[in-house]
């Protein structure tokens, strides 16, 4: 995909409007998890060091659109940036009719969702955003799947629209994993339900050499092979769909599993062959043989795409499957991309962050990209690059 990159532009003296993802958790006026701000800092610093007049904005939470609500203000983010950048960062509440900035100055524009017309991508608001800048920088991959005024409309109307370093890196990594992957490509899809990941599974079944399934999703595939899954979470109405997918793609299904009689973190894990699962059993993880077999498949992969844990890894007795998969990915010489909230939690828990080639910042956007859907913000950047 061809987009203009911010790093290729002359920024000195230019009014630069950065749409970042600063949607961070806040408690008692303090940022409680700074991962998204840290990810955005290099882009902001590049613009400041280049002598640009820098505006950065984001959504935060779900306020009633068009109404100011202090609970969802970006003020805590401004306080964080003041400390992180060691400079005077201002918060602008009323900015739609214009702002005066100096070169090397940073202003945070208040929560875009306080502006009426943001979610519906209204033209009037989009043009007001665009009038603020010479260059629009889209750097929020996590919102790239939404066509809103601050992610799409502004870019269609700004003099120049480009991808920020964070977004450009994301598109490059996902493109490398999906558009032209080194093979074999192994995709790992975990989660509780086939129905919520069906489009992802169908899309990946067409491009993956091996499609590994885990979590509740795997139970539906175990049932599709004719085995009893007891009281496990599975979807009987999607057994035929699972059988169809297994004909289209190599999907290694678990041969042994970790079971218990109740969903309880203190429940003892009982390892069973899939043919031995009883009516009152609940499957919560892969067994050691299945984990070892999948680890070998991952070890031979040249490209790995990972979305979702393969068991109830939050419970110590049922973390072995996800721990084993994590270790295999960490030790793999292949190119690995991981994304999705639970996946990131697993990466943190098993300490493999430094060993994954690329960790996606987008939840819904990551899944939609993997599904093969067009992301509106990316389509906008491609269109503007042609012009």
Swiss-Prot record:
Q: Which reaction does it catalyse?
A: (2R)-3-phosphoglycerate + ATP = (2R)-3-phospho-glyceroyl phosphate + ADP
GO molecular function per UniProt: ADP binding; ATP binding; phosphoglycerate kinase activity
The protein's matches in InterPro entries, at most eight in alphabetical order, are given as: Phosphoglycerate_kinase (IPR001576), Phosphoglycerate_kinase_CS (IPR015911), Phosphoglycerate_kinase_N (IPR015824), Phosphoglycerate_kinase_sf (IPR036043)
Pathway assignment: Carbohydrate degradation; glycolysis; pyruvate from D-glyceraldehyde 3-phosphate: step 2/5
Gene3D superfamilies given for it?
Phosphoglycerate kinase, N-terminal domain (3.40.50.1260)
* Record GO biological process: gluconeogenesis; glycolytic process
Q: Which domain of life is it from?
A: Bacteria
Family, similarity comment = Belongs to the phosphoglycerate kinase family.
List the protein's name: Phosphoglycerate kinase
Q: Which organism is it from?
A: Aliivibrio fischeri (strain MJ11) (Vibrio fischeri)
Q: What is the lineage of its organism?
A: Bacteria, Pseudomonadati, Pseudomonadota, Gammaproteobacteria, Vibrionales
